[in-house]
């Protein structure tokens, strides 16, 4: 049994690395969603002119991890109050976004954000939209943190997120 979740919380390398730590997650694919051109390239998305977001698509086993648990990790590993930026990455392609696949996912995401709002000084700006289209990113983006652990960006931004998942969500790890 497999279900799909799609989220974006800044650079997809970081979100991919964090989600891959979780038991019940079968695959995590970095890619692009939204936007107004088909099959965008990284260069096009980074230009900020296509309205795509960097996202990850997560195939998971709902008997081992629930959608709400994926949301818990998603919100713990990025700042949902930052509009169109995460850390050093600025632009609409780095926005906080949940792209739902079902009405149930949408309801869960809306309820989760409503409950979480009281825990932040600033309003949560995470967008919730129905997923219309997803394109896998170029191959060199897939498993980027795993393949490039000593990359300076990965050490500064992805590694702390992975460590947070390992320390905070020990019962959910692979």
UniProtKB/Swiss-Prot annotation:
Record GO biological process: protein modification process
Protein name per Swiss-Prot or TrEMBL:
Peptide methionine sulfoxide reductase MsrA
Query: PANTHER family this protein is in?
Result: PEPTIDE METHIONINE SULFOXIDE REDUCTASE (PTHR43774), PEPTIDE METHIONINE SULFOXIDE REDUCTASE MSRA 2 (PTHR43774:SF1)
Q: Could you tell me which InterPro entries the record lists for this protein?
A: Met_Sox_Rdtase_MsrA_dom (IPR002569), Met_Sox_Rdtase_MsrA_sf (IPR036509)
Encoding gene per record: msrA
Q: Which organism is it from?
A: Haloquadratum walsbyi (strain DSM 16790 / HBSQ001)
Q: Pfam families, alphabetically?
A: PMSR (PF01625)
Q: Where is the active site?
A: 11
| Keyword Lipid biosynthesis annotated | no
Question: What family does the Swiss-Prot or TrEMBL record give for this protein?
Answer: Belongs to the MsrA Met sulfoxide reductase family.
User: What Enzyme Commission number(s) appear in the record?
Assistant: 1.8.4.11
The record lists the catalysed reaction(s) as: L-methionyl-[protein] + [thioredoxin]-disulfide + H2O = L-methionyl-(S)-S-oxide-[protein] + [thioredoxin]-dithiol; [thioredoxin]-disulfide + L-methionine + H2O = L-methionine (S)-S-oxide + [thioredoxin]-dithiol
**Which keywords has UniProt assigned to this entry?**
Oxidoreductase
HAMAP family named in the record: MsrA
